[in-house]
């Protein structure tokens, strides 16, 4: 993706990099209802992020078989941690492509540093590492991503489509996917019951 390639070569960060994007009540696009998106790259050319609280039906072992990383017999023998690794729905764009957000203890040449603590890798090498227990300490994987053109996300935020707040590794990698939306709102002092459509930035 051009935006990620640009981020690897450009100095500095966009002001929405390493932020949570939280869908406001009344989100008009059903694909993003109650969604939390982690922004991986942002610049004047656009933005790219991954929904972190929607899951796919596909299981991680099945994905490894589909990608030719291992056969079905090898997939059956995966350690429990790899078998239970949740595949998430990262967004409506390029849904056949996989992305792994992970802690900075694992880096390869293709890894994109989003923040001091968080990297993004989109190659099969990290899937092999995770399946063999040699992967990062914390990771989440998603198929597809969420993307915006130049100025599009800024407009949606200004029109109160989204709240933004700084991301934290603890909430990003927290395994409680169902409660992630409410927990992130609570972390910035917002009760969903009192959140109005006119709310601004957190």
Swiss-Prot record:
Listed SUPFAM superfamilies: VC0467-like
Gene3D superfamilies: VC0467-like (3.40.1740.10)
GO CC field: cytosol
Domain of life: Bacteria
Family: Belongs to the UPF0301 (AlgH) family.
Cross-referenced HAMAP family: UPF0301
Protein name: UPF0301 protein mlr7511
């Amino acid at each position: 993706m051009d935006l990620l390639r640009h981020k690897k070569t450009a100095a500095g960060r966009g002001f929405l990099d390493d932020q949570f994007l939280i869908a406001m009540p009344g989100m008009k696009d059903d694909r993003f209802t109650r969604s939390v998106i982690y922004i991986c790259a942002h610049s004047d050319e656009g933005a790219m992020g991954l929904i972190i609280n929607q899951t796919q039906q596909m299981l991680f072992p099945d994905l490894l078989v589909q990608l030719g990383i291992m056969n079905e017999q090898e997939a059956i023998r995966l350690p429990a941690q790899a078998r239970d690794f949740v595949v998430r729905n990262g967004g409506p764009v390029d849904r056949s492509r996989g992305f792994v957000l992970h802690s900075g203890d694992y880096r390869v040449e293709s890894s994109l540093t989003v923040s001091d603590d968080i990297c993004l890798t989109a190659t099969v090498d990290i899937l092999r590492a995770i399946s063999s227990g040699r992967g990062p300490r914390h990771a989440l994987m998603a198929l597809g991503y969420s993307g915006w053109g130049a100025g599009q996300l800024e407009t949606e935020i200004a029109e109160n489509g989204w709240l933004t707040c700084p991301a934290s590794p603890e909430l990003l990698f927290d395994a409680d996917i169902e409660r992630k939306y409410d927990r992130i709102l609570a972390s910035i002092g917002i009760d969903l019951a009192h959140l109005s459509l006119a709310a601004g930035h957190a």
